[in-house]
Amino acid sequence: MNEPLISDISRTGRKGYSLNSSDLIRTPHSQLIPGKFLRQSPAELPEVPESEVVRHFLRLSTLNYHVDKDMYPLGSCTMKYNPKINDETCSLEGFAALHPMQPESTVQGALQLMHELSGMLAEITGMASVTLQPAAGAHGELAGILLIKKYHEAQHSKRTTLLVVDSAHGTNPASAALAGYTIVSVKSNGIGRTDLNDLKEKLNGDVAALMLTNPNTIGLFEKEIVAIADMVHKNGSLLYMDGANMNALLGITRPGDMGFDVVHLNLHKTFSAPHGGGGPGSGPVGVCEKLIPHLPVPVIEKRATSEGARYHLTGDCPDSIGRMMNFHGNFAVLIRAYTYIRMLGAEGLRRVSENAIINANYLLSRLDGAYSLPYPKPVLHEFCLSGDLQKKSHGVRTLDIAKRLLDYGFHAPTIYFPLIVSEALMIEPTETESRETLDRFADAMLQIAKEAEECPETVLAAPETTPVRRLDEAMASRQLNICCR
């Protein structure tokens, strides 16, 4: 289906809605708005009747791929099914009708929810305290790195380098650079984990912290994490964990118990809020005891009064890094995460991670052999295959495999990441997929491997069933044009 732009179905004189003349403001625009802000010519808005507007956007909605339609195996993105009760709770009038500038006395329920959520996340991660302000994962990274920087400044220690493991989450180096640090990469060893010898060589008095993801983006748990923490702390550095893959650890182990000083979470991933397309997200940051004075303001405090518990926002934190954003984070995502945790409880959260690990290993067991496995199994919640076999033997790249998968009705996995895996296919099935769905996906991947061997031209020409076939993605990136005309 080739759906035209709404501007292309516009016809002069057609109307979708007419304003009643009694609703119109009688005062001339020039008296209400400064002239420099007024248009000199009419806006080129499409003239389309209501029926065509509804049909246009309904047709577009059927072209969208989302987790309510089928499995969404993007590695390191945790595209799990989002329970609809989460939407029910954040749509309650007491939450949905709030304004962030209301008096504190009128938002006690919202403050209580945030205070309790912060406490639950601290318990889940084993950290001393958690801030909910950051709006997404990379924003949480930046907050965590600024906390590290503030800590060293308070210790009168000027450290300018951050170590980042090459299997860490992709935004880590960018966040570190934004905070003004020089980034030094730490290598992985032959089994996909941090190379302790390389780490030892690169630790020195200029290193502020080591950033790593655990489990890493290959889906492997850093078994030497206690030794890593010991090495880092003996150097006077801090240990930062990117919690992008926390879906593998719930109720099983905690970052704080491993020795991490800072961890950020992705509530929209691990704790189930719809995400993709740029948001919305939430990236809370948990810290150890010595970093609490530097947390962003305002901080929510619970105080006992004659009327019972009351919640207050306080900015009386002289050593804080300050605000990370206006108001207090993406509140609707916080409500969804709170609901998710309360519905599942401690036992349910552990089952989430156990099932995510089982699903990933089952799927890997079906695909291992048809595709190259760069590092040994077992894995945790996700795994990384390589399309090297198909590329070298049949000229079929990972990109071609991903495009062909669209013809089988599935969203493609994450491709070409992590960078330490050639022709990478990173797959995360999550805990919410049934065995039947996993088998359908595995069957499609196995059929594509067979096609690559027997009729590679079919894979090279894919996709064939999608409304739009292959886009020139390189040109789109280099010659950005978002204008419809």
Swiss-Prot record:
GO terms for biological process: glycine decarboxylation via glycine cleavage system. Transmembrane segments: none annotated. It comes from the Bacteria. It is an enzyme of class 1 (oxidoreductase). The keyword Oxidoreductase applies. Its EC number is 1.4.4.2. GO terms for molecular function: glycine binding; glycine dehydrogenase (decarboxylating) activity; pyridoxal phosphate binding. The modification N6-(pyridoxal phosphate)lysine is found at K269. InterPro entries: GcvPB (IPR023012), GDC-P_C (IPR049316), GDC-P_N (IPR049315), GDC_P (IPR020581), PyrdxlP-dep_Trfase (IPR015424), PyrdxlP-dep_Trfase_major (IPR015421), PyrdxlP-dep_Trfase_small (IPR015422). The keyword Oxidoreductase applies. It catalyses: N(6)-[(R)-lipoyl]-L-lysyl-[glycine-cleavage complex H protein] + glycine + H(+) = N(6)-[(R)-S(8)-aminomethyldihydrolipoyl]-L-lysyl-[glycine-cleavage complex H protein] + CO2. Its cofactor is pyridoxal 5'-phosphate. One of its GO terms (cellular component) is cytosol. Keywords: Oxidoreductase, Pyridoxal phosphate. It holds the Pfam family GDC-P. Belongs to the GcvP family. C-terminal subunit subfamily. The glycine cleavage system catalyzes the degradation of glycine. The P protein binds the alpha-amino group of glycine through its pyridoxal phosphate cofactor; CO(2) is released and the remaining methylamine moiety is then transferred to the lipoamide cofactor of the H protein. The glycine cleavage system is composed of four proteins: P, T, L and H. In this organism, the P 'protein' is a heterodimer of two subunits. This is Probable glycine dehydrogenase (decarboxylating) subunit 2. It comes from Chlorobium phaeovibrioides (strain DSM 265 / 1930) (Prosthecochloris vibrioformis (strain DSM 265)). The lineage of its organism: Bacteria, Pseudomonadati, Chlorobiota, Chlorobiia, Chlorobiales.
